[in-house]
């Protein structure tokens, strides 16, 4: 019976890690889709799914990351600090690019948001 519980826990952790990876790629894809639309002058805000799904995906990405962090009991390691810093940069750059207050968004903020996000993904992959 103990083996079954351990095996199920292991499967749950593996599923959580795969969900985290899925949400990372989904968040990146949604960033690129909204960014491309914004750069081409398309109103992505008129598409309800593109207004809601990025927030949901990013939230589930962060929550799954925190749960993984708790389950694996990571200390404060360099790669974790770097991922957190890149996550903050991604949020700042994306917020500047997608701000409603700016009539003509600067594409550099979009590219910096993409680089920050991909950098965080690469750190996770290469650590």
Curated annotation (Swiss-Prot):
Membrane topology type: Multi-pass membrane protein
Keyword Lipid biosynthesis set for record: no
Main location: membrane
Location in or out of the cell: Cell inner membrane
InterPro entries: SirB
Gene Ontology cellular-component annotations: plasma membrane
Positions of transmembrane segments: 13-33, 61-81, 82-102, 107-127
Keywords: Cell inner membrane, Cell membrane, Membrane, Transmembrane, Transmembrane helix
Pfam families linked to this entry: SirB
Annotated PANTHER family: PROTEIN YCHQ
UniProt similarity note: Belongs to the SirB2 family.
Protein name: Protein HI_1253
